[in-house]
Amino acid sequence: MLIIVESPTKARKIQSILGVKTLSTIGHFKDLPDSQIGVDLQTYEPTFVYHEKKQHLPEELRKAAKGETVMLAGDPDREGYAISCHIYEEVKSVAKACLRMEIFEVTEKGLKESMTKAVPFEQTNAGLYHAFLGRRIGDRLVGYILSPIASRSLRNKYSVGRVQSPAVRLVVDREREIRNFTASLYWLLNIQLTKDGTSFLAYHVKGKFEAQADAAALISRIASETHATARKVEKKETRQAAKPPFTTVDLQAAAAARLKFTPELTMKLAQGLFDHGLITYHRTDSVRMDEAFIAEIRTFLAQSVGAAYLPAKPNQHKSKNSQAEAHEGIRPTHMHATAECAERIAREQLTPEHVRLYELIFLRAVASQMAPARYDSTLLLFDVAGESFKATGRVLKFDGFLKVYAEGEEDKEKDKDGKGSEEKLQTLPALTVGEQVVKERESLEEKKTKPPGRFT
């Protein structure tokens, strides 16, 4: 048997686990030529050539594949399938059989499962290769034809791309919106109330006042009042559910917000973690997790943080894309003590950046199977001289999954009324309907509307 993958690191890891000869192509070994367009403009048929530094590779692959059952194990995505297609064309005439093997985790269990599910390459989904062709041919046509035109027109060397040019247009349009934006003032009217030593803010139910005079008139109206009367007291327990394991997009967002990693760096580090058998495949829209691994997480949680943090049944997270359910979300391949994260990365001779990303993935996966956080949420409505004011508060009652994976900037929803998170999280005193509380002061907060934000 012979296994062929893209990455030399992954090849070494697989061979060490299975004891099966494993070769790598080091990515694509065929592409469109650099010196010409490489696409028939009548039929859109591409002409692929060997990379200059990989001219020897096809012969090496044929020699190794002769008489062998060949597992074509490029990554389980469009690019990986395309590489497998190109390998197949080279070795099909000499190999005993060619099978497509999709690897989602580089572990003994994961590799053996992938081998048992391998299918004859002729029976695989050629649509993935057509998707690759559409992308690659589109890249070449747009770039090769339009870049010279743009360079001549703009009198400088410019590159036009299928993706980069529309992306630049979106960025430019947003920047124009920002530069052309004219801020307008608005005001928020609040009162400071006090009971039993607890001071808190209540805001006028109207929210924004676009005319300062209107807000000032209300200030004058309530200024002489010394108390506010509680008209409504509503208390309830609210729950914040644990978030699912990472998808690719969620991982990039969290790594940018928490670790200050660019999306490119995040994917490079994740590729290294995957190739070394530390995480499952990192290009995924799925949030599903293997049931056996969920059981491992639950055992780990029971031993490390206690049964109170375990829901009665495992959390079932649903992917937005039903087709993604065949795969898993991004998770570690092995459960272990949290303190061992750095040690495991060190054994693979990876970097501190790999450690930080791995810890993020590890903690998110663990937290996804924890009990929800519970809050005591309170809504109070007050009357002051016939005007209504609202105070909301939330007190953490049980931290649940937050014990392991605290809420980050990428998780927080912005306040719709512009009052900020302070009001939401303030502590409110116990009150009954009809009770009066002391009004310490009233004030206007001057605010400005904000332009749309830049893309992140």
Q: What are these model-predicted stretches?
A:
Residues 106-193, 235-239:
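C-terminal or mid-to-C-terminal helical accessory/interaction module adjacent to the motor/catalytic core
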Residues 261-324, 330:
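Extended, well-ordered alpha-helical scaffold/bundle regions in very large, multi-domain proteins
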Residues 91-95, 119, 145, 149, ...:
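A generic secondary-structure signal for well-formed alpha-helical elements
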Residues 4-6, 25, 73-75, 192-194, ...:
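Generic beta-strand/beta-sheet core signal
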Residues 6-9, 13, 52-56, 78-82, ...:
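Charged, alpha-helix-enriched surfaces in structured cytosolic catalytic cores
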Residues 1-136, 140, 145, 424, ...:
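Intrinsically disordered, low-complexity regulatory segments
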